[in-house]
Structures are given as structure tokens and as C-alpha cells.
Regions:
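Structural signature of beta-strand start/N-cap positions in the alpha/beta core
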Residues: 22, 47, 87-89, 111-113
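Conserved HGGG/HGGXW glycine-rich cap/lid loop of the alpha/beta-hydrolase fold
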Residues: 6-64
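Gly/Ala-rich beta-loop-alpha elbow adjacent to hydrolase catalytic centers
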Residues: 92, 96, 100
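Short "lid" loop at the C-terminus of a central beta-strand within the Rossmann-like core
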Residues: 55, 118-123, 160-161
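Active-site loop/oxyanion-hole signature of alpha/beta-hydrolase fold enzymes
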Residues: 49-91
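Conserved alpha/beta-hydrolase catalytic His-Asp/Glu region
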Residues: 148-180
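Short, hydrophobic/aromatic-rich segments at coil-to-beta transitions
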Residues: 1-2
Length: 180
């Protein structure tokens, strides 16, 4: 699997050769291309590109000052989109849905079709005056990305945050395996 450089940050991405149009798969927070493993047989034969975001497996770490700039993830996805010949189909989940929506706004001529599940607008908090929301989000990001959690602890915190405390531990083993 190849890598690209975006503003001095190394991004790993899954690339599967196949027929056009390309499917650009944008994963959720905390997940990488493995999130789509059950989807791949359904689109077998298509060209697939799926970036691993900053600080995710096989991608580099944040090198900037202060908090991680999520716009860098967008720039990586945009770079991959613009490398493709012709239009692409975008499939995005959660954070990946947010990135996909931004790509569609900024590059409508490159998008043939798009499908998003639970797109979250994390980036909107950068433009709000609500310090309480910024602080809560900052704590979540810090917990998820900068405390050096083991993968299992990260998944527990992430799933519990978006659901209820204990949600991760109450999942059936085969459901947890889908996240790993």
C-alpha cells in the first residue's frame, strides 16, 4: 500500500486496482481501511482508494504545533481525489462523511455519486463561539489521539463516548472484532 506526503505529513492509503470510476472510501474516526473489508466484495472489480488519516495505522503522526489540524486529513483525501482520472464515487462514514461532503462542495465536477452514513460535522466547532463545545471536543480528541491509548482502550473510549458507558464491553465478540 502506498503513501503520500501532505504538507510534510505522511499518509498511508489502501489502493486496489480495478475498473473506473474509482470508489474513494473515507472511514470513520479511529478506523482505517479495514472498516470497509465487508464492503470490498460488493464492489469487487472497481478501483478503490482509501486514506488512513493522520496518526492512524501506517500513517505518520502530527508534526505541527498545538492541536491536530483535521484539515490535514481533508487535504490528503483531496490530493487522492484530484489524482484520479475522471469522476469518482465517494463512500464515507462519520468523519469520512464530513470529509466527503467537503470534497463534494469544493470539487463537484469530480464527484459522480456519493453515499454517506452518519456524517458528522466535527469541523463546524472551529467556527463557533461556544467555548463549552470546543472544550468538550478538545477533551475527546485528546483522549482519542494524544494519550497513547492501546487500540482496545481507544475503541472502548470511542464507542462508549458515542453510545453509553459500557457499550464496548457489552458488545458481542464478533461485533468488537468488526471494529478491530
Amino acid at each position: 500500500m502506498p503513501n503520500i506526503d501532505v504538507n510534510g505529513h505522511n499518509f498511508h492509503y489502501l489502493e486496489i486496482e480495478g475498473e473506473q470510476p474509482t470508489v474513494l472510501m473515507l472511514c470513520s474516526t479511529g478506523l482505517d481501511s479495514r472498516q470497509w473489508r465487508d464492503m470490498l466484495p460488493l464492489i469487487e472489480g472497481r478501483r478503490i482508494v482509501c486514506p488512513h488519516y493522520l496518526c492512524y495505522p501506517k500513517s505518520g503522526n502530527w508534526k505541527g504545533e498545538g492541536d491536530i489540524d483535521s484539515w490535514t486529513d481533508y487535504l490528503a483525501a483531496e490530493s487522492l481525489l484530484l489524482r484520479e482520472d475522471g469522476q469518482v464515487d465517494i463512500l464515507g462514514h462519520s468523519y469520512g462523511g464530513f470529509i466527503g461532503l467537503m470534497l463534494a462542495v469544493n470539487h463537484p465536477e469530480k464527484i459522480r455519486r456519493m453515499a454517506f452514513h452518519e456524517p458528522t460535522v466535527w469541523g463546524c466547532l472551529q467556527h463557533t463561539d461556544r467555548e463549552d463545545l470546543k472544550n468538550e471536543f478538545g477533551e475527546v480528541v485528546e483522549t482519542f489521539f494524544t494519550e497513547g491509548l492501546e487500540p482496545e482502550d481507544f475503541l472502548r473510549d470511542f464507542v462508549d463516548y458515542w453510545n453509553v458507558p459500557g457499550a464496548w464491553d457489552s458488545m458481542l465478540d464478533n461485533r468488537r472484532d468488526m471494529w478491530r
